[in-house]
């Protein structure tokens, strides 16, 4: 089952988010900070999260953040996080999360953006198989 997450799902999302952050090299994590981060995103309507389950076990999530297009005068969403526990990969959970997000936003947004590493061939193949296209623009970043 895959569904839109709400405040009651925070405890289920916390371990998934911590595993996801560990994958990206975050070694020291504070569970209270993670919980507060999720709480703020959900209660302040700053992100949309879908969670997927194997029976009653949470196995993955997708989190999207809003932005806007001045040209189209519509909201668009940035797919920032997609995580499925390793033992549940290649079983349709990531596709279910992606499908839920696409369906939810179909009439609510211009579209989606995402960024993945050029060397992440697994993710790139997944996104291509799910209808994503690389664009003709150069994407610049400036981080502190």
Model-derived segments and spans:
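Conserved active-site alpha-helix within GNAT-family acetyltransferase domains
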Residues: 95, 118-136
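A short beta-loop-alpha structural element at the N-terminal edge
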Residues: 1-15
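A short helix-loop-beta-strand connector motif used in the catalytic cores of GNAT acetyltransferases and
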Residues: 39-51, 78
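Conserved beta-strand-loop-alpha-helix junction that forms the acyl-donor binding cleft
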Residues: 89, 112-123, 141-144
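Conserved beta-strand in the GNAT
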Residues: 51, 57-66
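Conserved acetyl-CoA pyrophosphate-binding loop and the N-cap/start of the following alpha-helix
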Residues: 88, 92-100
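Conserved GNAT acetyl-CoA-binding A-motif
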Residues: 98, 105-116
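Conserved GNAT-fold acetyl-CoA-binding loop/helix
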Residues: 17-39
